[in-house]
Amino acid sequence: MRGLKATIPDLARHEVLNPWIERRKFQRADFGVFAAIICARSLFEVLCTEFKAFALVVFDCGILANDKDKAQEYRAQSIQYFHAVLGEKDDFPNLTCFPEELQHALLCWNEVADHIRSARSKDTLKVLLRQILYYVESVDTLDTVYSRNHVPSPKQYLSRRERTAGVYPVIATIPFIYGIDVSQQQLDSELMQLLWKHTSHLVHMINDMFSLRKEIADGQIENLIPVLMLNNDVDCDTAMKWAIKLVEEAAQSFHNIKRHFQNSHTDTHEITTAFLEVCKNVIMGLTHWSYTGQRHFHHSEIVDGKIIFKV
């Protein structure tokens, strides 16, 4: 793939996604942190806590890519840690055997959990713990997508990424952001499950497009674009266009779910309103952050509203 060229249109201004953009909210988020977008109506203390919570899903776990035993150990210790900090059942594990970066990715949750526990019910904490464990249990499976020389289908890959992308733990912090309590039963409806699923798909598909070059450079190719290339025998730019089509379809499904929620009359209106708004902001927060930062490409590579780069 090295040397091939790919083009990404301006998703922040794409006709399917454009209705989600709130320009004034983005102006308040000039420092490019997801938390400033999804917490735009929250107290500053909530924003700070949410920002620190992101350390769990933003840090680069590739540091353990070449040490499977260590990755499995980190996974086990992480599970014990979150049971201790959110479930208050287990003893805290000793993390000193891990690199400082990985220690801090967990230990910042001491403060995060204190704030969330003081503000929300035990049922709400159980929802958050469940989604964090769902993500953490996938930590030692990263970069095994092509194991045994098997190329997954796009459907298999997207299903796998629902777990490894770390979107669900972010969604599970929405009750904390909005100051509401929820139970797992209230979140088990078919529409709510579809909302989470399509939010996750949009986030990790968009991220895969933006991060392709960085992942190849880092030797971590857990990415939709190569999956599309290998399944369909197409070049990188064609696969990128197909990925854009998948994003459009997922965005349309998201809009359909929103309309269904708006036409339904239930006693969970406050909860559904909160999840709809923040899920939209999570998606566009990622897009905004990707365009304004230089983690994946330089501003000079944005030409006529498109990103043109060599892999």
Predicted regions and their residues:
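Alpha-helical, largely C-terminal catalytic domains
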Residues: M1-V311
